[in-house]
Each structure stands twice: as structure tokens, then as C-alpha cells.
A protein has these predicted regions:
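C-terminal segment of N-terminal export signals and the immediately downstream linker at the start
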Residues: 40-62
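Segments of small-molecule ligand-sensing domains
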Residues: 358-371, 382-451
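N-terminal secretory signal peptides
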Residues: 1-22, 32-36
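Twin-arginine (Tat) signal peptide motif
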Residues: 18-27, 45-49
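Extracytoplasmic "Venus flytrap"
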Residues: 60-83, 107-113, 135-136, 223-230, ...
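Beta-alpha junction/loop-to-helix N-cap segments that form part of ligand/metal-binding clefts
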Residues: 51, 71-78, 89-176, 193, ...
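Extracellular/periplasmic periplasmic-binding protein-like sensory domains
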Residues: 169, 194-195, 299-375, 387-388, ...
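Extracytoplasmic ligand/sensor domains, especially the bilobed periplasmic-binding protein
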Residues: 129-255, 307-333
Length: 480
């Protein structure tokens, strides 16, 4: 089938619901700006910018250092310390005959959208030239929309592009699931979107079906929240649009409430609710991490053992695997950074492997995938700064960010790629797509990164969307 098929039919429903989630967060951010009384007027912002030292480029970095999303920001201190030691940040960057020093100010959102707005306001009032932000819609969208409101360049990551796009006034989703309407002027982002989750998970389903006796019944554990309702509405239709011959039968476990403590009824549905009363051998979800831990423990106790579990939003970090212990074995998820990629820093030439090894050797614990995306934010900033004549001209800098095209720690990132392949193409100017790959949690440490051994590691078992990532593990049935 043609690659364009991915954008046909009901896939748009999922994109639209991610968009609406972003829209709500964007409106909430605007409400905080209006109600707080702390937001600067445009005149105040201009005055703060004029007061900034002409020889200093000020960058703000916003992430959830504390709170429910803190795992995403776990490597921040290490990554930023490394960034500050690189040549451009240590010695300055020469633009138009002037050498500018770069100053980084870090802010913690406490994993709260209203705090994200407030700390972004503080950065704007201090006269930052650029804001970088990472990790989940609850962080990224309030930051990005605040920057757009006050014409401050901003780059975001680790958020589905559909949700990010939905935060901006004038943006919309087309009937085919693409970007439509008027997008932001001062914002850019890189990550991936709804089709990439499907393109990451289904190839693993197909592999396991060839390996063991596995039916096509798919258990859906989708909560009654923004992410869960979006997946419930369109994950199955999206699979059908991309893989029309898959024959998958989806069994919805019900729109449960977040932080539910008893999943017995859902488990029974998954054990007997498939075709001809069969169990669901495949499993997909998008829950809160504690809910997956509770469900997965109870499922094991009640003898529900799917042949392959492919999970979104959870099992992204080592802490998730350690919380489940042996029940983590061969649980699969999507990943966007690994030490085993061929990619390297555009700032220093350091390989992804040595980057992760340095993190572990320095005693920061086990490497995590968010370290790669955080690093790339600063690479992108430098790429844009090298392209402008005046780093304090916000419109010029924002425009340069929207056409960045380079290779770095997360691989090739092109913010304005025209391609017939919808997995690769930019949905709109200023949106760069990176390609995830399938991993499973397995005992041990692949190749002992940094000579540190850990009990559980992500092993790369499928690279259908990103063949540049080498496999270092074999896809195996979950919990077998």
C-alpha cells in the first residue's frame, strides 16, 4: 500500500483528539497569564530585552525537575553541565563579527501547567532571547503558548506534535489528520506523532505472531482521561488504515478512572473477550505509571499473560522497570534515544555511546532516553544562532529555528522536510520528525555502557521505522 495511506480515513480522529488536548492546555495557559497579573506587557518585555547585555545571549530552559513528571528531567543537571562545557557555551559564539557569551537559566515546572506558565513569564521578564522546553504536554504546551503570546522564540520536544500544534490559536487538524490552519510564528518542535506509535508497535506484533502461536486479539487498557480517550477513539482505526490486512480485533477494557486499584473485571474481559471467547494475546495501553504497575501485578496474579505487551507512556525509564521487577521481562515500548545509535553530538562530536557512558560513569545512575532529546534542544539552538545576523532579533531567530536541518545526538532533524513519506515529512514548517524504534526490557545491560551493569535494560528489538538503529536484542514473548 502507498505511504500516503497513513493519512486516510479515521486516523484523523486520533490526531484531532491529541490536538484538542493541546488546545485545552493552551487555553488554560492563556487563562493563567490573564488571571495571575504577573505577566509582563509587551512594553515590559521589550524593556527587559533592551536591558539585556548586547554581548550576551540568554537562553531559558524549562522542564519538570520535580513532581509526577520528574523522571523525564532526571538527567537534566548532567546534560546541561556537559552543554556548558562545549565550545560555543564555554567560549562564546561569533555572529556578525561579535562574540556573544551564552547564559542558560533553568526553571522547574514542578510538573504543573500553571507553574510552567509562571516560570516562563519570569524568563520572558528577564529578557531571554530563546526558551527551550521538554517533557510532556503538561510542560511543553503552557511554555510554548506563553512564548508565542509574547513573541519569544521557543523550541519544544517530547510531546506528540498533534498535541503541541493544538495549543496555538488558529491551528487546526485537517480531515486527513495533518496540520492545518495558522501555526505559530515563534515556535518550533521535534519529536513524533500518532502514526509513529502505531508504526513502532505493530511490526513487533507481526514478529511475535511469526514466532509463537499468537492470535490477533488486542487488549486495550485506555483510561478515562485525555490520552486514554484519544487512543480509544482512534488507535484501532489508525492500525486499520496503516495495516489493513492485519485482521486485528480490539477489545476495550473500559474507560476506567485514573488511580483505580482493582482491575479484576478488566482482566477477565481480556482473558475471555476475544474472538470465540479467546484471550487477548496482544496488549496495548496508555496509563499512568502507577496504574500500569497495579494492573500488571494483578494480571499476573489472575493468570492473564498476553504474548506481547506494547505500552505507551509507561516503561520509558529504568525506574518503571525496577518497580515491577520480574514482571518487566520483555514488556515492549517505543524509544527515541539509545547509546547504540550511530549518532553523535553536533557540538563536540561525542558519540551517543560515550554520552551515555559518561552519565553512568559519573554516578548519575542508568542512562535514560530523555537525555538525548534534551541535548538536542541545545544543538538546535546553536544551529539557528549560527544562521542569524542578530541573535536579539526574535523574529529572525524564530524563523531560523523553523528551518534548522542538521544531524546530531538524536539523529537527523529537519524542521521543514518535504517528503512523500509521512513518517519523515514535517507536518508543518517548524516541526521535525524523529523516528522511534521498538525496545523490550530485559535482564542485564547491553554491552555494559560505561562498564556499569544494571539489572534491567532496554534492548532494541525492532527498527522498522529507523533502520539506522542497530538491533541488539531479539523480540521475545512478554513474561516468558
Amino acid at each position: 500500500m502507498s505511504e500516503e495511506k497513513i493519512f486516510e480515513g479515521d486516523r484523523a480522529g486520533h490526531a484531532l483528539r491529541e490536538f484538542e488536548f493541546g488546545r485545552r492546555l493552551g487555553l488554560q495557559a492563556l487563562g493563567v497569564m490573564v488571571a495571575s497579573g504577573a505577566v509582563a506587557t509587551l512594553a515590559d518585555v521589550s524593556a527587559a530585552q533592551a536591558a539585556a547585555k548586547s554581548g550576551t545571549i540568554k537562553i531559558g530552559y524549562v522542564s519538570p525537575r520535580t513532581g509526577a513528571l520528574a523522571d523525564f528531567a532526571g538527567p537534566d543537571a548532567f546534560v546541561l553541565a556537559l552543554i556548558k562545557k562545549s565550545s560555543y557555551f564555554l567560549k562564546g559564539i561569533k555572529i556578525g563579527g561579535t562574540t556573544y557569551h551564552i547564559e542558560i537559566t533553568e526553571k522547574d515546572t514542578q510538573s504543573q501547567p500553571n507553574v510552567a506558565v509562571q516560570v516562563t513569564q519570569e524568563l520572558i521578564n528577564s529578557g531571554v532571547d530563546l526558551v527551550l522546553t521538554s517533557s510532556a504536554p503538561e510542560t511543553v504546551i503552557p511554555v510554548a503558548t506563553t512564548c508565542e503570546q509574547y513573541k519569544v522564540p521557543c523550541v519544544s520536544t517530547v510531546v506528540p506534535w498533534e498535541a503541541w500544534w493544538g495549543g496555538f490559536t488558529g491551528a487546526s487538524i485537517s480531515p486527513q489528520g495533518g496540520a492545518a490552519g495558522t501555526g505559530p510564528t515563534y515556535n518550533s518542535m521535534f519529536f513524533y506523532g500518532v502514526p509513529h506509535f502505531v508504526g513502532c508497535f505493530v511490526p513487533m506484533w507481526e514478529k511475535i505472531q511469526k514466532k509463537v502461536n499468537c492470535n490477533t486479539n488486542v487488549a486495550e487498557m485506555f483510561p478515562n482521561d485525555s490520552d486514554g480517550n484519544a487512543f480509544r477513539a482512534a488507535f484501532a482505526p489508525t492500525v486499520g488504515a496503516i495495516y489493513p490486512n492485519g485482521g486485528y480485533n480490539f477489545v476495550d477494557g473500559g474507560a476506567y478512572t485514573d488511580l483505580t486499584t482493582d482491575y479484576s473485571a478488566m482482566i477477565q474481559t481480556f482473558k475471555t473477550g476475544g474472538k470465540n471467547g479467546a484471550a487477548c494475546d496482544l496488549f496495548v495501553n496508555v496509563p499512568l505509571p502507577p496504574d500500569f504497575q497495579t494492573f500488571w501485578t494483578q494480571a499476573s496474579q489472575q493468570d492473564y499473560n498476553p504474548k506481547l505487551a506494547t505500552v505507551a507512556k509507561v516503561m520509558l525509564f529504568p525506574t518503571d522497570a525496577y518497580a515491577l521487577g520480574d514482571l518487566s521481562n520483555n514488556v515492549a515500548t517505543d524509544s527515541w534515544f539509545t547509546p547504540y545509535s550511530p549518532y553523535k553530538s553536533s557540538l563536540t562530536g561525542q558519540s551517543a555511546y560515550n554520552f551515555a557512558a559518561a552519565y553512568q560513569t559519573a554516578g548519575h545512575g542508568q542512562w535514560v532516553q530523555s537525555m538525548g532529546s534534551t541535548y538536542s534542544l541545545f544543538e538546535i539552538a546553536i544551529q539557528a544562532l549560527k544562521a542569524v545576523k542578530n541573535p536579539h532579533n526574535r523574529l529572525e531567530l524564530a524563523s531560523a529555528l523553523q528551518v534548522v536541518n542538521y544531524d546530531g545526538m538524536c539523529g537527523p532533524i529537519n524542521m521543514n522536510l518535504k517528503s512523500a513519506n509521512p513518517f519523515l515529512a514535517s507536518p508543518a514548517k517548524g516541526i521535525g520528525m524523529i523516528q522511534p524504534f521498538g525496545v523490550q526490557w530485559k535482564p542485564g545491560s547491553a554491552d555494559l555502557v560505561g562498564h556499569r551493569k544494571y539489572a534491567w535494560s532496554q534492548w532494541i528489538v525492532d527498527n522498522s521505522l529507523n533502520p539506522h538503529i542497530p538491533l541488539n536484542g531479539t523480540l521475545e514473548p512478554t513474561n516468558v
